[in-house]
Amino acid sequence: QDNQDCVALVKDIIEKLRDLGDDLLLGPSTACIVNAAEERGIPSIRLSEGNLVQLGYGAKQRRIWTAETDQTSAIAETISRDKDLTKSLLRSAGVPTPEGRTVTSPDDAWEAAQDIGLPVVVKPIDGNHGRGVFINLYTQQEIEAAYAVAIDEGSEVLVERHIVGDEHRILVVGNKVVAAAKGETVWVTGDGKHTVQQLIQIQINSDPRRGTAEEHPLNPVRIDSAVELELARQQLTGDSIPGIDHKVLIQSNGNVAFDVTDLVHPDVASQVALAARVVGLEIAGIDLVAQDISRPLGEQNAAIVEVNAGPGLLMHLKPASGKPQPVGKEIANHLFPPGTDFRIPVVGVCGARGKTPVAEM
């Protein structure tokens, strides 16, 4: 019993130290930019207990907060949070987006789906991190259930035409694509013994890349209302025991990132850079659904579904597979192009007498 108490105490201390580290240390997105700047000799000053950091001195300084900078306008950020407005602006510039509209009730969602054509996507108009997003919905029951979840994640709900393909996150910095990652769906495979809930713990959450701390690129999977709806579409619950080799879809947008930066077609790069400019963001995370990112968008009926301000960088720093991308260096170089003067002269004068005349010389 004493040994068990000691183990429990040590685990508790370790957890508290991790929480303390999360509170005191810069987040990974901010840290990678600061580290890249310091490698060039650019000084940094932490301005808050959070992630607000000053790079450079005086009139030469720039400020960042994760992947947002002092040039990220409130207008552009507000536009990016409104998915329907963003799509309208992108369409006016010729950027491909999925057809859709906002809806006000479950019945309205079903009516919109019929007008657009099945299958559809249902998602909150101002949600984030993929919460409340449901894809490839066919039936009235699925669409109305998805509406009920999506409305809890945002102020309004958007119904869109479903685009066939994989979701990609493309990072644009200063009108240039610097990283791209492909998302993968999350599945478990039945063994005839364990429940879906147990399989999630065994096959998904055991991955060391999953955790609640900021250094973990992937979050643990929990059976929330979104997962419950996904399981219900497969006539399952968290307590169901799938048969041997029976694959069960857990999350359609599991945010498991695979680096595909080297595969981005020039047409794709041009379109996503244009999307960032239309919204007004110098640093943007563009969500694109495409079957093959190495082909032009027009050849595959692909579409841009979201433009995000202050995008997370961890998926590019620690992809599930593929090479990490130097996104911190790219952002630092954008803020301070090579050859830029980022310091101001600082001279200290000390002594017992004559300090003022010397300082005024």
Model-based region annotation:
Residues 183-186, 291, 310-312:
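Activation segment
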Residues 294-301:
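Short glycine/threonine-rich loop-to-helix capping motif typified by GTGT followed
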Residues 59-220, 266-269:
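Active-site nucleotide/adenylate-binding loops and adjacent lid/helix of ATP-dependent enzymes
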Residues 149, 153, 202-294:
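A long amphipathic alpha-helix within ATP-dependent nucleotide-binding catalytic cores
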Residues 1-115, 128, 348, 354-358:
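Conserved N-proximal alpha/beta basic substrate-recognition cap immediately N-terminal to
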Residues 337-361:
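Phosphate-binding loop of NTP-binding sites
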Residues 306-317:
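Glycine-rich phosphate/pyrophosphate-binding beta-alpha loops
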Residues 319-334:
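N-terminal pre-Walker A segment at the start of P-loop NTPase domains
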